[in-house]
Swiss-Prot record:
One of its GO terms (biological process) is fructose 1,6-bisphosphate metabolic process. Signal peptide: none annotated. Its main location: cytoplasm. Its cofactor is Mg(2+). Homotetramer. Its EC number is 3.1.3.11. Belongs to the FBPase class 1 family. Keywords: Calvin cycle, Carbohydrate metabolism, Cytoplasm, Hydrolase, Magnesium, Metal-binding. It comes from Chloroherpeton thalassium (strain ATCC 35110 / GB-78). This is Fructose-1,6-bisphosphatase class 1. It is an enzyme of class 3 (hydrolase).
Length: 349
């Protein structure tokens, strides 16, 4: 058996490249991993302990809250908020920012989606937790502020996700590559299983909810037709794979290559996914793995948020696939002759 590397050891060893490190960041990530174990313990027992189904309420997004959503949100808030490592937190499930219960405020900011894909819980489909970590901008010593949370994704110091499937895997980046850890339930530790993950430059999978086809812009409709055309040179047609759990679809495409798209629609002109809780953390991971992420026109990590629960379209995955999708979205490409068109501003008069 090879050397067993826990997530705590992995982060500690990476601290050698940062002489000013105090160890707080390592403990912080370990807190996240611990909270994920608590959630997993209940995810696998959900049908036995009466936490499946609806809680009879809606969250700030206007979505029906599942019982396990509430449990996961509570576990992350409690497990992480009581150690004084954070100045402020924000959850997809809470309307306002969350301040630590103690008078000790740390230097980090945590934003998280406690249970992504929760609409699939009752069907026993993979769900996950997504998190994003920033350094506070406000003065140290006091509570964090809303402005601490409204930072560009490019300012993240770490992001990651945990996927609860046939096995439990935690994937994270601190801007020095992407690493995956699989939970060994016999010892209760996340062990390094996927070191320095790199996503293929181009894949053969596209993931999107084509049930909304009638609401898509013409550029996206053309892109779908492009993916379905047969062309051996570009390895088309692509295979459609859509789970309906963003983190699960992203995880598969990260490993095998491909693109996940949740575009703007006539029903959701600003997009559907949350910039702070889903798009930013996944975009950071994707870029660190060699991929690309945008809203179809602008790099996700360059978007300056103006509100806590801001939504955005999302094009994320293999670099070449995302670039082609962006060209269709921007009207720079057409399936009629399958080639990039000159921008309208450059067209000869």
């Amino acid at each position: 058996m090879g050397d067993l590397i826990t997530i705590e050891r992995h982060v500690l060893e990476s601290q050698k490249d940062h002489p000013g490190a105090t160890g707080e960041f390592t403990k912080l990530l370990y807190d996240v991993a611990f909270a994920a174990k608590l959630v997993y313990r209940h995810v696998v027992r959900a049908g036995l302990v009466d936490i499946l189904g609806s809680a009879g309420s809606t969250n700030v997004q206007g979505e029906e809250v599942k019982k396990l959503d509430l449990f996961a949100n509570e576990q992350f808030t409690k497990a992480i908020g009581h150690h004084g490592r954070f100045a402020v937190m924000a959850s997809e499930e809470n309307e306002d920012i969350i301040l630590p219960p103690l008078d000790k405020y740390g230097k980090y900011v945590l934003l998280f989606d406690p249970l992504d894909g929760s609409s699939n819980i009752d069907a026993n489909v993979s769900v996950g937790t997504i998190f994003s970590i920033f350094k506070r901008k406000s003065d140290a010593g006091g509570p964090g502020t809303l402005e601490d949370c409204l930072q560009k994704g490019a300012e993240q110091v770490a992001s990651g996700y945990v996927i609860y499937g046939s096995s439990v895997m935690l994937v994270y980046t601190t801007g020095q590559g992407v690493h995956g850890f699989t939970l060994d339930p016999s010892i209760g530790e996340f062990l390094l299983s996927h070191e320095n993950i790199k996503t293929p430059k181009r894949g053969k999978i596209y993931s999107m909810n084509e049930g909304y086809y009638r609401y898509f812009d013409d550029g996206i409709k053309k892109y779908i037709k492009y993916l379905q055309q047969e062309d051996k040179a570009s390895k088309r047609p692509y295979s459609a794979r859509y789970i309906g759990s963003c983190v699960a679809d992203f995880h598969r495409n990260l490993l095998y290559g491909g693109i996940f798209i949740y575009p703007r629609t006539a029903k959701s002109p600003k997009g559907k996914l949350r910039l702070m809780y889903e798009a930013n953390p996944l975009a950071f991971i994707c870029e660190q793995a060699g991929g690309r992420a945008s809203n179809g026109r602008e790099r996700i990590l360059d978007i300056k948020p103006t509100e806590l629960h801001q939504r955005t379209p999302l094009f994320i995955g293999s670099e070449e696939d995302v670039k082609i999708a962006e060209e269709f979205e921007q009207g720079l490409r057409d399936i009629e002759h399958d080639e990039a068109l000159c921008p309208k501003s450059l067209t000869s008069e």
